[in-house]
């Protein structure tokens, strides 16, 4: 599987914030998107997963010679956790499992993977900020999508949870998954190398594509 972005431009509030942005990632690889606040990291991720239309350019996901709809192949984890506070943790994850299809881990195993075993009966709104984020990470595990698009995924996590999520990302890559992550802090993926010696993690600095810098 291969994801290509070609000559993308994105706008916010009617003003172009980045342009001439291109990249390619393949199976088992990750792209870490960095840059100052307001540089367009979140806008780029929303364009890639189809939540926003690009001002220019295109995004294409292919498997062999077949074009695959990005929306059908990706998990998107944004700033918001996208969970109903009044529903239990289990009910929220069950909704997303059925909505996304492609069952992977069962809910209990997914919660155990984020060190939240035993909370599935609790209302989501009862959880702490860090626990809520970990439930949202568990959402990535209860149904299989090859492409993870995650925006500041470690927000609200402690160091132990950050390390646990880094290992989950590495495992996803080992299973031929792809990851695009926007972040302002290290995600613990630096230095990942394939068996052939190729770097599996690339970085993209949004500052290099800002309209001011290009002008």
UniProtKB/Swiss-Prot annotation:
| GO CC terms | plasma membrane
Q: Which reaction does it catalyse?
A: heme b(in) + ATP + H2O = heme b(out) + ADP + phosphate + H(+)
Please provide, alphabetically and separated by semicolons, the GO molecular function terms listed in this UniProt record: ABC-type heme transporter activity; ATP binding; ATP hydrolysis activity
Question: What Gene3D superfamilies would the database entry show?
Answer: P-loop containing nucleotide triphosphate hydrolases
KW Transport (keyword) present: yes
Q: What is its main location?
A: membrane
Give the keywords, sorted: ATP-binding, Cell inner membrane, Cell membrane, Cytochrome c-type biogenesis, Membrane, Nucleotide-binding, Translocase, Transport
Give a short account of what the protein does.
Part of the ABC transporter complex CcmAB involved in the biogenesis of c-type cytochromes; once thought to export heme, this seems not to be the case, but its exact role is uncertain. Responsible for energy coupling to the transport system.
> Which residues are in the ABC transporter domain?
3-215
Q: Which residues bind ATP?
A: 35-42
Q: Which gene encodes it?
A: ccmA
Q: Which Pfam families match?
A: ABC_tran
What organism does this protein naturally occur in?
Brucella abortus (strain 2308)
Name assigned to this protein: Cytochrome c biogenesis ATP-binding export protein CcmA
Q: How does it assemble?
A: The complex is composed of two ATP-binding proteins (CcmA) and two transmembrane proteins (CcmB).
Regarding protein family, the annotation reads: Belongs to the ABC transporter superfamily. CcmA exporter (TC 3.A.1.107) family.
